[in-house]
Structures are given as C-alpha cells and as structure tokens.
C-alpha cells in the first residue's frame, strides 16, 4: 500500500488540473504495455476509458504475486464487456468445469424426459406448473371371460330346427304368419305368444298379414292399379280417383303393376294415361287413338285433339249422339226449323264471339266480358252452389278495413282466416265450416264431379273433358248486333281504302313505263307512212319526224335526273 501511495503525486503544485490528468493517463498506458510484454499468457489490454489511477497500474507490473488482482480485474471487465478471453491454463480449467456442469444438466434433462414419458405430470411439477391432482380410477378386477356354451335342445324338436336356421341364415321367421323374423329363439317364442290371432288374407294375391294396417298398406302399395267397380262391372271413376289420391298422398308415388314395367308417377293423370297404353301393341294403340272427324288426323289425348280442333277447325262441338242428357237442351242446332247449322256458321259464331269480347272490353272496361257472353246458368256446363248474401253496409265496412289495415279477417268465431280482398273473403265464407251458412259445391255436368271452387271446375272441364266450360249462344242481343254492324262497316271502309290505295300505286307505276313504248311506236308509224307514201306517190313532208327526235333527249334527261 505504501508503494502505491508513494507513486501517486499528492501535491498538486502550480500545475493545472488538466496537466495532472494527462500525465496520469500516459503513465497508465505505459504500465499496461509493459504488463502485456512480461506475461505472454495475458494479452488483453484494458481500454483507456477505465478510471484506474496511475499508482495502481504501476504497482501491477512489479511482482507476479500482485498480478492475480489485475487478472481478476481484467476478467471482470471482460465479462462486463462480453468478450471471450484467450485460451489459458486457468481458462481451460474453467472450461472443463463448465463442460462437466453441462453434461450434468444434460443427464438431468434426459432423466426428466424419461420420467415424463412414464408420468407426464412430473415435468409440469419440475417446471413449477400447477396442476390439479387427478383422481386415479380404481383398477377393475380382471375377471375371466367365460365362453357361453351353445344351448342344447332335444333332438328333432322345433327349437333345434329354429336354432339351426338361425345359425345358417341369421334369423328365423314365424311359422304362423311367415312375416316376422327373429334372431333368437326366446324372441321368436315371445312373438308367437301374441301371434295367435286370425290372419288377414289378401284377396288379390292370397298373402296373409298379421294386422289390418299391414293389409291396407299391402293393398295400397302392391294392388293400387285395380279399379273400384260398380254393381254393373263399371268403373266408378270418382271413387277410383279418390283412392288413387290417398295412395299418392301416403306412398308419394304411383307404381305401374306390370312385372316388366318399373315406371312410377307422381300425378294421377300421368298414371292413368300410362296404364291405358302400357303393354299394348301398336295395333291396339291405333284403335285407342282419337281421330278428328273433319280431317281424320289421329291424336293420343283429348287435350291434343281439342287444341287441333280449336286451331284448325274453329270451336269444339260434339255431335248430338255423344251429347249428355243434361246438355241436350242447350244444343247449338236449331230445333224449330229443322235445319242443321253448318260448320261455317259455327265458325262464324266463334269469330263473332271473339269480336264481341274485344268490343265489350273497349266499351265497358269495368264489366266482366264472360258475364256478358254467358249471362245465365242455363248455358254453363257446371252447376253453381248458393252463396251467402251480404248487405251494402257490411261490404262498405270490409272495403274501409282493406284501405286501413290492408286485410280482412273472417267474421266467424274461431276462424283465423285473413284475406286481402273482399272477393276472397266472400269465397271463403261460402265454404267456411265455422259459420251458419251451409254452401254446396260446384258440380261438373259432364261427369258429376264436385269441386270447392269455380276455377277448379272450369280447369277440370277444360283439361279432362277438353271442352269449353260454357256453351256459345248463337242468338245475339240488340246491342251486340249494333256492335257487329259497326264493326262490319269499319272493316268494309278499311277494305275500300286499301283497294283505292293499291289502284293509285299501280297507276303511278304504270305511267312512266308506258311512255317509252308510245314514243317508239310513233317513229315506226312515221317510217311506215313514209314507205307507203313512196309507194303511193311522191309526198315528201318530213315534218312530224323532227319533233319526235327531240323526245328521246327528254327521256334521257329524265333518266339522268333519276
């Protein structure tokens, strides 16, 4: 310590502080350089930024025993500056110790990994993670599985036969009903206890079924093509269609019952159309074809024939023999005079009807055209039921409700039907079951089928019977006759105007075409006259030939302008 204190210049003297500081820095640098030369094992020089005094640096170079302190200082500074020292004996020893520590850490980690494989909870505990202790399930006592021995039945008994059938096929059917199958003999015996009732036998195929519901389903699914017959072996079409409708509702489709045909249908009309022609030869199909009695063209359906009749031969009219009794009174043929109406007259009536509908829509736009053409029920092909009558006050109230709330509710108690128009509410009240009014149904006069709505019966007559739902009335009213006379006058005037315009256009086209032949004929006539004059006698007067030469120039001038 004395040597260190003696080396330090304690007395400042007259020199300034800057000079003292510079001398200290220079002395420290020299001492560090000497230390690095003396000890080759330590080659690191402390940078000049450190705040060591000159005395400490000078004393570090005197003995070797004091060098350990400087070495410790240098390693400390090296660690602070993150600089790796050179390889020395001491450093090598420290490196070996560190390697041993790393190996120990690796061994510990391996042991932890092995423990984690066996018990994964251990690793979480080592790393300080909290984990709830899981309740270990109680180990179940491992009982020996005893293989059941096959049951033994008496030789030749029914149980033995059933058991052999189960082993062979997987199930055995009930010997009573032959419809139910079981996989065990116990289950079969339990079924046979309840299977002692009388069986339901299908009268179509002879199959026996256990329940009435099963029999109904069997008939509906497999025998839906068999028609329902009346007393005289006639097909009852309304009940037959109703039965097919229920089959279609439950099964979702109608299946053709021919073995060679696998067609299915989702509509009754398509099914009936297919059944009528399925499995029949071409000759039989030709007999079933409907032929037009005007031109003899064959059609497969009534709808196709009706469309052909309307488009090619005017409206559809059936002869007197095929007309039903309920429509004979409304026949279109004249009864009093005994004269049969011709086809051209029928077509004229049809066209008059179209003209009348067009004129009525122009003259009375708010009035229904069909109501004017078919005013009374005697000319309809269906009957209308009685509809309820409403007072003007009720109708006015309903109209105001529609303007305010845009809807009307049915006035009957318990009915929640809502409509957006008065006509819809009227139609609903005619068929509402919660009210006091009991209304009938719309009935088709051609097949006596009933419908709930008028649009339904109209569609039925047009599609099924391929006819109009009303009969055209050949006798017209006075207003209708006036309208037709006015229409005929307008048509005649239009025709006259067209003819007059055509004549004028033809005259205009013929005038420029006729002028050149006249001009060509005149000089020829002059030449002939000149020749004749020469023959007859000398009369040289070429006066008419000169003005004719000027005319072709005019024609050429006109052509140039064109």
UniProtKB/Swiss-Prot annotation:
Subcellular location: Nucleus
GO cellular component terms, A-Z: nucleus
Region (Disordered) location: 1-32, 86-150, 489-562
InterPro entries the UniProt entry points to: Krueppel_C2H2_Zn-finger (IPR052274), ZNF512_C2HC (IPR048408), ZNF512_znf-C2H2 (IPR048403), Znf_C2H2_sf (IPR036236), Znf_C2H2_type (IPR013087)
Family annotation (Pfam families): zf-C2H2, ZNF512_C2HC, ZNF512_zf-C2H2
Biased composition (Basic residues): 122-147, 498-507
Source organism superkingdom: Eukaryota
Keyword Membrane: no
Transmembrane annotation, as ranges: none
Cross-link (Glycyl lysine isopeptide (Lys-Gly) (interchain with G-Cter in SUMO2)): 18, 84, 230, 335
Keywords: DNA-binding, Isopeptide bond, Metal-binding, Nucleus, Repeat, Transcription, Transcription regulation, Ubl conjugation, Zinc, Zinc-finger
SUPFAM superfamilies: beta-beta-alpha zinc fingers
The keyword Ion transport is annotated on this UniProt entry: no
Single annotated GO MF: DNA binding
Renumbered zinc finger spans (C2H2-type): 200-223, 290-313, 442-465
Polar residues bias (residue ranges): 12-23
Function: May be involved in transcriptional regulation.
Family label: Belongs to the krueppel C2H2-type zinc-finger protein family.
Protein name according to UniProt: Zinc finger protein 512
Organism of provenance: Mus musculus
Species classification: Eukaryota, Metazoa, Chordata, Craniata, Vertebrata
Gene name linked to the record: Znf512
């Amino acid at each position: 310590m004395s040597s260190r204190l003696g080396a330090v210049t304690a007395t400042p003297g007259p020199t300034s502080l800057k000079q003292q500081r510079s001398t200290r820095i220079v002395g420290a640098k020299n001492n560090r350089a000497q230390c690095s030369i003396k000890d080759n094992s330590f080659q690191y020089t402390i940078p000049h930024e450190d705040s060591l005094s000159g005395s400490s640096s000078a004393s570090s170079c005197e003995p070797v025993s004091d060098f350990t302190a400087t070495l410790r200082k240098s390693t400390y500074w090296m660690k602070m500056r993150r600089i790796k020292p050179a390889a020395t004996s001491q450093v090598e020893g420290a490196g070996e110790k560190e390697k041993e520590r790393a190996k120990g850490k690796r061994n510990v980690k391996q042991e932890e990994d092995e423990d984690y494989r066996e018990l994964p909870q251990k690793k979480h505990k080592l790393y300080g993670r909290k984990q709830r202790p899981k309740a270990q399930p109680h180990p179940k006592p491992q009982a020996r599985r005893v293989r059941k021995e096959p049951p033994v039945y008496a030789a030749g008994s029914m149980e033995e036969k059933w058991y052999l059938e189960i082993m062979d096929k997987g199930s055995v059917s009930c010997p009573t009903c032959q419809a139910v199958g079981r996989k065990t003999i116990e289950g079969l015996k339990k079924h046979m206890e309840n299977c002692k009732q009388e069986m339901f036998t299908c009268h179509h195929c002879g199959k026996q079924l256990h329940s009435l519901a099963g029999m109904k389903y069997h008939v509906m699914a497999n025998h839906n093509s068999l028609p329902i017959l009346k007393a005289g072996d006639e097909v009852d079409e309304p009940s037959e269609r109703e039965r097919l409708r229920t089959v279609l509702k439950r099964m979702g489709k109608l299946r053709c019952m021919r073995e060679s045909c696998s067609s299915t249908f989702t509509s009754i009309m398509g099914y009936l159309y297919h059944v009528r022609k399925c499995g029949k030869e071409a000759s039989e199909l030709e007999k079933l074809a409907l032929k037009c009695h005007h031109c003899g063209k064959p059609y497969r359906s009534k709808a196709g024939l009706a469309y052909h009749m309307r488009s090619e031969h005017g409206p559809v009219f059936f002869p007197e023999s095929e007309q039903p009794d309920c429509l004979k009174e409304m026949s279109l043929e004249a009864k009093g005079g005994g004269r049969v109406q011709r086809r051209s007259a029928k077509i004229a009536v049809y066209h008059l009807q179209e003209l009348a509908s067009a004129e009525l829509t122009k003259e009375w736009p708010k009035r229904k055209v069909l109501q004017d053409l078919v005013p009374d029920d005697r000319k309809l092909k269906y009957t209308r039921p009685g509809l309820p009558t409403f007072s003007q006050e009720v109708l006015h109230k309903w109209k105001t409700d529609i303007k305010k709330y845009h809807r009307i509710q049915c006035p009957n108690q318990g009915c929640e039907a809502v409509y957006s128009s008065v006509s819809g509410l009227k139609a609903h009240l005619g068929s509402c079951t919660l009210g006091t009014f009991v209304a009938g149904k719309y009935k088709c006069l051609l097949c006596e089928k009933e419908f709930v709505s008028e649009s339904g019966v109209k569609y039925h007559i047009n599609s099924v019977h391929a006819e109009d739902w009303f009969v055209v009335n050949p006798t017209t009213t006075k207003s209708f006759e006036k309208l037709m006379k006015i229409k005929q006058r307008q048509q005649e005037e239009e025709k006259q105007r067209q003819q007059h315009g055509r004549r004028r256009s033809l005259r205009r086209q013929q005038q420029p075409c006729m002028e050149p032949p006249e001009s060509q004929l005149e000089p020829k006539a002059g030449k002939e006259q000149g020749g004749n004059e020469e023959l007859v006698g000398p009369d040289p007067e070429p006066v008419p030939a000169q003005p004719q030469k000027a005319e072709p120039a005019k024609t050429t001038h006109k052509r140039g302008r064109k």
